[in-house]
Amino acid sequence: MGTLFGTDGIRGVANRYPMDAPMAFAVGQAVTYVLKKEKHRTRIIIGKDTRISGYMLESALLAGITSMGGNPYLVGVLPTPGIAFITESMRADAGIVISASHNPYQDNGIKIFGGNGFKLSDEQEEVIENLVLDGKLADKVPPVDRMGQAHRIDDVLGRYIVFLKNTFPRELSMEGMKIVMDTANGATYRVAPESFTELGADLDVIHNAPNGININAACGSQHTEDLRKRVVEKGAAIGLAFDGDGDRLIAVDEQGREITGDQILIICGKMLKGKGRLKNDLLVSTVMSNLGLTVACKKYGFRQHAAKVGDRYVLEDMQRLGSVLGGEESGHVIFLDHHTTGDGILTAIQLIAAMLESGKPLSELARLMDVFPQKLINIDVKSKPDISTLPQVVQAVKDVESALGDQGRVLVRYSGTQNMCRVMVEGPSDEITLKYCRQIADVVKAAIG
């Protein structure tokens, strides 16, 4: 990763470098310049989530794109995967998403999709980053008669809803199915309720009144307490929790228990395998996936590949290895037969299809995978030296791995978006897992905290 781009685009506190108006302006210019073609005016989709800072960044990107001769198309508030879909379906040259996903409202971010609906590669982002940082974009602007014009597209919601509904098998019906939904006061606040209502669900929606500063606030995929309680109160079949930009899903079963992304992978993988649609019998997960996923894959005859953390790396390995299903424990799930990126609403639709096809409640399907106790501790760090160059940390990891044997595992890695080191330990019990996780975290903190 470079100076600006992390594992999921550019992130930072809004109205502060690098997530300020001058930077957004420069990114708009750089993307337009890189994508410029002979006799073709670059067309770029711009969408956002519900953060108050989205207006500023949207305007700055628009100015940068038009100043470099491109035509921006504004779609307003739309989930990240919706922007990827619109970019590809409109044959635009790129799509820019203004969002910081599950982060609090103070943060914002910029991520970019290519014209094919896939996120840009590291190499493409590096070219854009170098243009932004060399300070010479002003020398590359066209004359006034070649400046671009902004447009607004008003029917994107309907287009995206039709796409989502078409992924639900026609022989199935959600008619009368009780569903509770938490949109995190985020980008799914309109499209998710409308999609499920049109599919016939009996819907109860919470945390669905965005005001610019309540996105992800004690709600959504990171905070399912309210959703779990409401599902039980309403006697619902399932609860659906999206994050701020709508690219991930955490589900809740009818008993009010949380279902992770790993469990969703196993449930949907078994459904696809039963239909002969799980290409190469392969699931792509990440190194952070629960050990229970590996055990379940062996039990049901799936092959499993662990990618680096980040949905972009999951996708890259899916394409390289020929897989149609992959994802992360956090709820990013990619159905490559349907979409180019993780989509929380699409994932919810597929999960409900698996429930209806099996005739089983979600609590029973969740038992397809035994979840190993897992503890994650995040440590703020001043720098990010290679873990292998820290002998005391390496030794601490070896000691714990030796103690756990085949009853658990250890992972120490840096965050791709924050100055943070993550220590994850899985083991046979909560007590042992917490003990060993704290043991390693203390060593990491002493070394680089």
UniProtKB/Swiss-Prot annotation:
Supply the HAMAP family for this chain: GlmM_B (MF_01554_B)
Q: According to its UniProt record, which cofactors does this protein need?
A: Mg(2+)
What does the record give as the reaction this protein catalyses? alpha-D-glucosamine 1-phosphate = D-glucosamine 6-phosphate
UniProt GO BP: carbohydrate metabolic process; peptidoglycan biosynthetic process; UDP-N-acetylglucosamine biosynthetic process
Modified positions (Phosphoserine) are 101
Q: Which gene encodes it?
A: glmM
Q: Name one GO cellular component term.
A: cytosol
UniProt PTM comment: Activated by phosphorylation.
Q: Which GO terms describe its molecular function?
A: magnesium ion binding; phosphoglucosamine mutase activity; phosphomannomutase activity
Cofactor note text: Binds 1 Mg(2+) ion per subunit.
Indicate the family of this protein.
Belongs to the phosphohexose mutase family.
Annotated residues for binding of Mg(2+): 101, 243, 245, 247
| Pfam families named in the record | PGM_PMM_I, PGM_PMM_II, PGM_PMM_III, PGM_PMM_IV
Q: What does this protein do?
A: Catalyzes the conversion of glucosamine-6-phosphate to glucosamine-1-phosphate.
Q: Under which name does UniProt file this protein?
A: Phosphoglucosamine mutase
